[in-house]
């Protein structure tokens, strides 16, 4: 796997990112970190992709439907990557320039893991885009067994009946681990 050559963080602030499978504990841990840090620092909490992508037809199709033939997954990856670039330059970077600590629930690593887990490991464009993305000061990956993550997701009332592709979850976990080793 190639290394992501992200843009160094040259701001006064700090960027911490949290990635992993749905149900791995990211949100719980980032909320704890936020609670501890905001006692003494300006903290800005965000998530990627933003709601603009999360509410789009293409995103909802992939999240809620077992039939993924309606779209080429790379189109969703490009949408998510463009959202991350826009969000990074217009939201995250200004907060970092102010000296804030920015904590992101998911980041560019999630886009890469999802693309690779779906069989597009040779698509170089994702690595080129990474050059315009700020490298986090610390990136956390939460690794739990797939079964544990899925059980946690299913325990949420709103996601009790959500479609989950178990094979994809195993591949995602493998890709996250590979990304951690390469970066």
Language-model segments: what does each one mean?
Residues 41-131:
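ATP-dependent small-molecule kinase phosphotransfer cores
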Residues 134-135, 178-183:
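A structural motif corresponding to the C-terminal end of an alpha-helix
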Residues 23-24:
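ATP-binding Walker
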Residues 1-15:
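Extreme N-terminal, non-catalytic leader segments
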Residues 111-174:
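A glycine- and Lys/Arg-enriched "phosphate-lid" helix/loop adjacent to the NTP-binding pocket
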Residues 18:
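Hydrophobic anchor at the beta1->P-loop junction of P-loop NTPases
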Residues 27:
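Walker A/P-loop
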């Amino acid at each position: 796997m190639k290394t992501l050559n992200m843009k160094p963080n040259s701001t006064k602030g700090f960027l911490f990112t949290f990635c992993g499978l749905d149900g791995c504990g990211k949100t719980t841990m980032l909320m704890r970190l936020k609670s501890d840090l905001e006692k003494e620092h300006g903290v800005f909490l965000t998530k990627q992709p933003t709601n603009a992508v999360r509410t789009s037809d293409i995103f909802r199709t992939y999240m809620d439907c077992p039939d993924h033939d309606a779209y080429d997954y790379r189109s969703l990856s490009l949408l998510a990557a463009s959202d991350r670039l826009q969000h990074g330059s217009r939201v995250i970077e200004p907060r970092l320039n102010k000296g804030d600590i920015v904590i992101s629930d998911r980041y560019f690593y999630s886009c890469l893991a999802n693309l690779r887990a779906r069989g597009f490991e040779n698509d170089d464009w994702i690595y080129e885009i990474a050059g315009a993305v700020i490298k986090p000061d610390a990136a956390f990956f939460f690794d739990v067994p797939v079964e544990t993550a899925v059980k946690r997701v299913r325990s949420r009332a709103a996601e009790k009946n959500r479609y989950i592709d178990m094979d994809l979850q195993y591949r995602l976990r493998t890709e996250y681990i590979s990304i951690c080793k390469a970066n």
